[in-house]
Amino acid sequence: MAELKGTFYGVSVGPGDPELLTLQAVRLIRQCPVLAAPRTSSGRMLALDIARRALGEELDGKTILPLQFAMSRDRDVLRASHEAAAAAVRPFLDAGQDVAMLNLGDVSVYATFGYLQRLLEAEGYPTAMAAGVPSFCAAAARLNRPLTGGMDAPLTIAPGGWDDRVLDTPGTKVLMKNGTQLPALFEKLAASGKLAGSALVCSCGLPDEAVYPDLSLDRPEGPAGYFATVLVKE
C-alpha cells in the first residue's frame, strides 16, 4: 500500500492587516504542522509575520520553513529558485505532513505558490488553495471607494512592467507592484489628465502603510516600496 503524501496548501493571509485572514486560512494554519513562507533577502518573512499577529502563540511548536525566491527576470535563475523551494518542501510531504505555504494577498494573484504548485503536482503531490483578500481590494476599502461602478464597468489589473497602453483602457486600472516606477507613472498620468482622482496605497495594512487618496494633491516624490498599488479610476 502506497504511503499517503501530505498536502501542499497555498494559504492567503491578505495584504497586511491580520483581521483580513479568512476563517479557512486560520483553520489551515492551525491544522498544518509545517508553515512555509517566502523570506526576503533581508530576512523578513512578511506573510509569516501577519499569521503570527493573528494567531500568536498558536504557531509555537510548528516547523517554520523559509523559502528564498530570486527576484530576477532571468528564466533560468527563476526556475532554479523555484526548484530549490520545491525541494525544501518535498521531504515534509513525503513524510505525510501537510504544508501550508503562506502568501501575501490572495494566493491566485501574482503569488509564488503557483510555481511550486505546478512542480509538485507534476510529481503527484496533492495541492489545494485557500482564497484571501487581494491587496487591491484592501486598498479600495482603505480608500473607502469602490473599484467599479455599474455592472458594465471594466476592471484592468496589471503588475509592474505593464505596457503603457494599459492606461488607455476603459474603466478602473489597478497597477500593482510598481513602486520603483512611480515617478514615471505620475508623469504619464499627469500628461493624460488622469492624475486627479487616481490614488496610491503603499504597504496596505502593514505598519509602514501610506495612503494618498488623490495624487494630484499629494504623492511621494520618489520611488516607493514593492507593495505599492495605484488605482486609476475614470
Regions found by a protein language model. Give the residues of each.
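Structural signal for conserved beta-strand scaffold positions within catalytic alpha/beta enzyme cores
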Residues: A37, T63-Q68, M129, G149, ...
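Short, surface-exposed amphipathic charged segments that create phosphate/polyanion-binding patches used
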Residues: V77-A85, R142-R145, T169-T172, V211-L217
